[in-house]
């Protein structure tokens, strides 16, 4: 890999991470968009793992990516299931009303 390719890939990863942060701060009311923004940030971090794994010729980063993507998929499925149940009970999905959960 040339230094230009590494710089471009790291810049692309930074842009993805920044879009995730921006999505969280712009839409503070919608829980689903916040969840997608967090997943986008996790994707950017995994992309960094892939870049440095290829750069250092080490397979640990790629194995770690598979592990984290598996856990992220399970986490997203559980989060969406909780949101669907919350929507059926309350009729609205908003950050303001999530504090009314009892547990």
Swiss-Prot record:
Q: Which GO terms describe its biological process?
A: ATP synthesis coupled electron transport
Compartments where found: Mitochondrion membrane
- Membrane topology (UniProt): Multi-pass membrane protein
Report the EC number(s), separated by commas if there are several.
7.1.1.2
Q: Which domain of life is it from?
A: Eukaryota
Q: Name one GO cellular component term.
A: mitochondrial membrane
Q: Report TM segments.
A: 6-26, 31-51, 65-85
Top class in the EC scheme: translocase
GO MF terms here are:
NADH dehydrogenase (ubiquinone) activity
Provide the catalytic activity annotation: a ubiquinone + NADH + 5 H(+)(in) = a ubiquinol + NAD(+) + 4 H(+)(out)
What Pfam families would the database entry show? Oxidored_q2
Q: Which Gene3D superfamilies match?
A: 1.10.287.3510
In terms of InterPro entries, this protein maps to:
NADH_UbQ_OxRdtase_chain4L/K (IPR001133), NUOK/Mnh_C1-like (IPR039428)
Mind listing the UniProt keywords for this protein, alphabetically? Electron transport, Membrane, Mitochondrion, NAD, Respiratory chain, Translocase, Transmembrane, Transmembrane helix, Transport, Ubiquinone
**Record's function text:** Core subunit of the mitochondrial membrane respiratory chain NADH dehydrogenase (Complex I) that is believed to belong to the minimal assembly required for catalysis. Complex I functions in the transfer of electrons from NADH to the respiratory chain. The immediate electron acceptor for the enzyme is believed to be ubiquinone.
Q: Which family does it belong to?
A: Belongs to the complex I subunit 4L family.
Q: What is this protein called?
A: NADH-ubiquinone oxidoreductase chain 4L
Q: Which organism is it from?
A: Acanthamoeba castellanii (Amoeba)
Q: Which gene encodes it?
A: ND4L
């Amino acid at each position: 890999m040339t230094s230009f390719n590494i710089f471009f890939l790291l810049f692309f990863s930074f842009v993805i991470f920044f879009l995730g942060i921006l999505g969280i701060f712009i839409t503070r009311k919608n829980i689903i968009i916040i969840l997608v923004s967090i997943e986008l940030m996790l994707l950017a971090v995994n992309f960094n793992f892939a870049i440095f794994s290829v750069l250092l010729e080490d397979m640990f980063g790629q194995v770690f990516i598979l592990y984290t993507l598996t856990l992220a998929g399970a986490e997203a499925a559980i989060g969406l299931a909780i949101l669907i149940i919350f929507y059926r009970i309350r009729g609205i999905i908003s950050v303001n009303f999530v504090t009314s959960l009892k547990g």
